[in-house]
Amino acid sequence: MSTNLCPNASSSDIQPILYSYWRSSCSWRVRIAMNLKEIPYDIKPISLIKSGGEQHCNEYREVNPMEQVPALQIDGHTLIESVAIMHYLEETRPQRPLLPQDVHKRAKVREIVEIICSGIQPLQNLIVLIHVGEEKKKEWAQHWITRGFRAVEKALSTSAGKYCVGDEISMADCCLVPQVFNARRFHVDLRPYPIILRIDRELESNPAFRAAHPSNQPDCPPELPNK
């Protein structure tokens, strides 16, 4: 995809580049946040599968030493880690805020984000599942997603309105929807989590969320059902 780079352009004139993998929930969070804030960006696909994983090549290691996605080149800087990226976007592009003004609601958003991004997703991430092994990876992922979703559902029982925290979309929603997708991939029984399911259904038709969906990414395999 075009990056619109111009040698005479200032860093603020260069369109951001998001290094992304179509099914990466971490990349997905950032895509949602950028779409919600209406920030134009180009995607540079990084396959986590092809040739043993393009994230491990020397060229990409210079972009992200953690050899993971996402990475975002923006304002003359390269940022890694999805939550750090979302906070940067929130601080530099305050339009369509993803954190509430109320300090208690803001803390609740961060709580839900941490449960998902620290307590669930890293434990069912590709790099972990490779070490767990093919025979046990489904059971492993189900265990950690179920454990984490119990905590998320409990948090939502006191914080949710239309969305995770009240009636405005927040970073918590940006993180929840991709994690529900992961749960379905690993055939987690989601019936015990009615609030999670309701919020996921509410957001599935939102244009920013729909555009960020894996099936709408340039590197999504053409044979994927419902692409």
Swiss-Prot record:
The lineage of its organism: Eukaryota, Metazoa, Ecdysozoa, Arthropoda, Hexapoda. It is found in: Cytoplasm. Glutathione binds at residues 24-29, 55, 69, 81-82, 121, 125-127. Its main location: cytoplasm. GO terms for molecular function: glutathione transferase activity; maleylacetoacetate isomerase activity. Residues 14-97 form the GST N-terminal domain. The keyword Isomerase applies. Its EC number is 5.2.1.2, 2.5.1.18. Its cofactor is glutathione. Keywords: Cytoplasm, Isomerase, Phenylalanine catabolism, Transferase, Tyrosine catabolism. Gene3D superfamilies: 1.20.1050.10, Glutaredoxin. GO terms for cellular component: cytoplasm; cytosol; mitochondrial matrix; mitochondrion. It catalyses: 4-maleylacetoacetate = 4-fumarylacetoacetate; RX + glutathione = an S-substituted glutathione + a halide anion + H(+). Signal peptide: none annotated. The keyword Cytoplasm applies. Glutathione is required for the MAAI activity. It comes from Drosophila melanogaster (Fruit fly). Catalyzes the glutathione dependent oxygenation of dichloroacetic acid to glyoxylic acid in vitro. Has no glutathione thioltransferase activity with 4-hydroxynonenal (4-HNE), adrenochrome, phenethyl isothiocyanate (PEITC), 5-hydroperoxyeicosatetraenoic acid ((5S)-HpETE), prostaglandin A2 (PGA2) or 2-hydroxyethyldisulfide (HED). Belongs to the GST superfamily. Zeta family. CDD domains: GST_C_Zeta (cd03191), GST_N_Zeta (cd03042). Pathway: Amino-acid degradation; L-phenylalanine degradation; acetoacetate and fumarate from L-phenylalanine: step 5/6. This is Probable maleylacetoacetate isomerase 2.
